[in-house]
Amino acid sequence: MAKTSRRRFLAGSLAAAAGALSRPSPAPGEPPRTQAPAAPRFALGLASYTFREFDLDTTMAMARRVALGRIALKDMHLPLESSDAAIRAVIAKVKAQGLVPYGCGVVYMASESEVERAFAYARTAGFEIIIGVPDHALLGSAERRVRETGIRLAIHNHGPGDERYPTPASILERIDGFDPRVGVCLDVGHAQRAGLDPAAEAVRCGARLLDAHMKDVTAATAEGGPVEAGRGVIDIPGFLGTLVRLGYAGTLSFEYEKDGKDPLAGLAESVGYVRGVLAAMARGGSR
């Protein structure tokens, strides 16, 4: 896109966000709206899957270019079968670049040994959280490992066509009564593709919302594809406002899946859009 049209697009998007976040007088019977919006408690991060076509050094350099200081590593950047020494070396390398390697994922677990491997890997790396997809029959084993290690498990929804966890509700119903450190990684794109409102899904998850993947999609159907944040159909200002009101204190990681061989421009636009919406919220108040 030409610079002029990109600037116009972003200016228009941020103006719309500011308008959406303005505070009309409450209707009769509505509680008064907060005059000073709460500051976001969540941090922005990067799902390294965004740079799946690139090595770790390039991925770290790109994370720094868009000023995303927290990173969740996918196994192409830190293989699950790595030795303890290799894991520690990679983590030291990431930290030396000023990045916080807060988690890993998405990690699939289809056997008891894969559950054991995932948690051993995360413990060696010092990860706070695993973004994972354990088979249904392994949820009990995964919860036991959460209790033993203190590492949180955020189960990722993958939208229409996923037989395990298509929606956040499909996760929540299976972990009801589990340790509170077992929860959901809310992928807003896949939620929207399932015809769901990501903001409502965040509310549904409540305290079980442990991680979130930020993206946008072209349609609220199974056919919806990835697109730069702000260009698709997701109500991103509404979603961000909901995270703020919920007091969500985890990481909102960008998982930009478009343009796999050249993702930086689209990622940068997406990060800029989200930061612009957050700035508009801070200036204009909450919805």
Question: How does the language model describe each region?
Answer:
Residues 2-43, 53-66, 123, 168, ...:
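Histidine-acidic metal/acid-base catalytic patches
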Residues 47-51, 74-78, 106-109, 135, ...:
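Active-site beta-loop-alpha junctions enriched in small/polar residues
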Residues 42-47, 71-73, 101-106, 130-132, ...:
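Hydrophobic faces of well-ordered beta-strands that scaffold small-molecule active sites
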Residues 1, 47-50, 106, 130, ...:
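Short N-terminal micro-motifs specific to bacterial/archaeal maturation
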Residues 14, 18, 57-60, 93, ...:
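Active-site acidic/histidine proton-transfer and metal-coordination neighborhood
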Residues 72-89:
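Glycine-rich, proline-tolerant flexible connector loops at the mouths of alpha/beta enzymes
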Residues 80, 139, 221:
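Short glycine-rich, flexible loops that bind phosphorylated cofactors or substrates
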